[in-house]
């Protein structure tokens, strides 16, 4: 295709594989019987210029030697110099050889400058989606409970998170965390220690997260695979596939990874408890839910208990508080569908977009792709 740029691999694809499927370190799938140098040579001869995350030169040097024996030194040198040329061209284009030094004063004017930070913060605000804004406990003169008036007494419960796994399957202990460790800015109101003292509860949650693999299940004769749950309470997969689509890892003696009939629970299940407990304790006072959405989530477990729901996708707390307290009238729309329930998740087609039965809340709003609200009501439908 006459591509003249750099081909860089994903991270960790040439090293020897982990001994068990539980590990998620090196991933040399399909070439696990080769040496690391042989894997590198295979990649190089197929057009790879750079190995992501690899700082060891030894296997590359060994790959060159093997290549010289196999293809001849002239051919291997030409191939290595081609990658060197591609890599160096980008550096030349940046002028880093001609002028490798930075002017600290000039850098200070550019990096983190007011203009760039303003644009970044505005992008955060624009991405926030107001899913629900009930009029039931709205102040006089407002169509919904949001924006909150400033100067209120606000209760914000701590989050309790159970034991979990990090990205590389490292064990993480249970923890308790304050969702606003720097405190509630005084311009918004006063944070209080109990729902009884508060005018409003502000509950920060994250979408349900779980561990989809169990060594205990494997030891007990299962295949180790558990359902990925998008709800907080225990989920039993009654409508999952009997036979999985994928399977056949060289470290497993089976190909069916089905989790049909198995149960899993979100390790942040206590997020749901916080909402329900606040609803009971607050009585007729409003409960506002602010959800960090890392993946689609089942809303029916708590939606009816919340007066307002604000969804964000990894922005600063300051941007969220702007929406809650009237500093920014939300404009964001859902970039995903929120499923009606876990059956809808299991029944959707993995390779088809926007085919899921979506959740309709207690106000009659459909949490479909493109849905969102502002303080006045539901945003107008997108023009196709």
Residue map of PLM features:
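C-terminal non-catalytic regions of proteins with extracellular/luminal or membrane-system context
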Residues: 2, 8-18, 33, 59-74, ...
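An alpha-helix initiation/capping motif
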Residues: 81, 85, 114-121
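Short acidic/histidine-rich active-site segments
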Residues: 3-20, 24, 38, 42, ...
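Long, well-ordered, tryptophan-enriched scaffold segments
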Residues: 47, 54, 58-98
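Histidine-centered catalytic/metal-binding microenvironments
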Residues: 103-116
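Flexible hinge/switch segments at interdomain interfaces of large molecular machines
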Residues: 95-105, 203-206
């Amino acid at each position: 295709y006459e591509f003249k740029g750099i081909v860089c691999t994903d991270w960790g694809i040439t090293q020897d594989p982990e001994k068990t499927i539980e590990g998620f370190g090196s991933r040399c799938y399909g070439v696990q019987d080769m040496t690391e140098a042989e894997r590198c040579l295979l990649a190089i001869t197929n057009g790879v210029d750079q190995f992501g995350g690899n700082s060891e030169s030894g296997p590359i040097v060994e790959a060159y030697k093997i290549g010289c024996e196999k293809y001849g030194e002239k051919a291997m040198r030409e191939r290595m110099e081609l990658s060197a040329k591609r890599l160096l061209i980008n550096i030349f284009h940046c002028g880093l050889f001609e002028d490798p030094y930075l002017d600290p004063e000039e850098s200070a004017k550019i990096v983190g400058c007011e203009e760039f930070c303003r644009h970044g913060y505005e992008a955060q605000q624009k991405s926030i989606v107001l899913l629900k804004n009930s009029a039931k406990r709205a102040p006089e003169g407002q169509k919904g409970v949001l924006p909150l008036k400033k100067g209120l007494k606000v209760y914000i419960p701590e989050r309790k998170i159970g034991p979990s796994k990090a990205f590389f399957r490292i064990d993480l202990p249970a923890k308790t965390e304050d969702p606003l460790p720097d405190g509630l800015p005084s311009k918004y109101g006063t944070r209080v220690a109990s729902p009884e003292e508060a005018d409003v509860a502000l509950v920060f949650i994250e979408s349900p997260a779980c561990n989809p693999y169990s060594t205990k299940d494997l030891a007990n004769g299962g295949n180790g695979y558990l359902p990925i749950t998008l709800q907080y309470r225990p989920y039993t997969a009654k409508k999952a596939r009997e036979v999985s689509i994928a399977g056949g890892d060289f470290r497993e003696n089976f190909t069916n990874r089905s989790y049909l009939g198995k149960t899993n629970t979100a390790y942040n299940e206590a997020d749901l408890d916080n909402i329900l407990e606040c609803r009971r304790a607050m009585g007729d006072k409003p409960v506002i839910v602010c959800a960090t959405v890392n993946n689609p989530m089942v809303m029916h477990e708590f939606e009816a208990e919340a007066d307002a729901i604000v969804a964000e996708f990894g922005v600063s707390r300051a941007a969220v508080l702007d929406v809650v307290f009237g500093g920014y009238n939300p404009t964001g729309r859902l970039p995903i569908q929120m499923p009606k329930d876990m059956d809808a998740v299991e029944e959707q087609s993995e390779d088809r977009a926007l085919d899921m039965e979506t959740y309709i809340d207690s106000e009659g709003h459909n949490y479909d792709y493109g849905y969102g609200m502002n303080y006045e009501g539901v945003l107008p439908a997108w023009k196709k």
